[in-house]
Amino acid sequence: MERFLENAMYASRWLLAPVYFGLSLALVALALKFFQEIIHVLPNIFSMAESDLILVLLSLVDMTLVGGLLVMVMFSGYENFVSQLDISENKEKLKWLGKMDATSLKNKVAASIVAISSIHLLRVFMDAKNVPDNKLMWYVIIHLTFVLSAFVMGYLDRLTRHNH
């Protein structure tokens, strides 16, 4: 009975495979939205105010960071929790594949969330005159919460690595 349960639990990790594939579909959706934004901006580029262009560029950077986060979670999560990626020798392989454990992934995700939050906060500040003060305050508090969380996770990771 114990062997059956252990084998069933171990095999259940494959339930995550379609979830990671779903993230790749989300990446396709994000790429479509990215290029939709570019196509929307190009005809108006010469009539746009500089601040509006900067807001669009920040949105594009934001989408790029989210895309990188998706790729990192897809590949690292799959390798850590489902199976090793079998990439042929003659194909280009990302250097970090197979080297990022769950803790490293968690720290990278936290750093990415802080970067994404920073971009979002910058966009909000560029339009600060149209945003109520209490809403600005909450944006800053939420961002600082992300920063503090990422810092604490990194610090705790350093402590546990130092003690082992």
From Swiss-Prot:
Keyword Transit peptide: no
GO CC term, one of those recorded: plasma membrane
Domain of life: Bacteria
Family: Belongs to the UPF0114 family.
Topology with respect to the bilayer: Multi-pass membrane protein
Transmembrane segments: 10-32, 53-75, 136-155
Primary localization class, coarse: membrane
Record's keyword annotation contains Transmembrane: yes
Species: Shigella flexneri
Annotated keywords: Cell membrane, Membrane, Transmembrane, Transmembrane helix
Record's protein name: UPF0114 protein YqhA
Subcellular location, record wording: Cell membrane
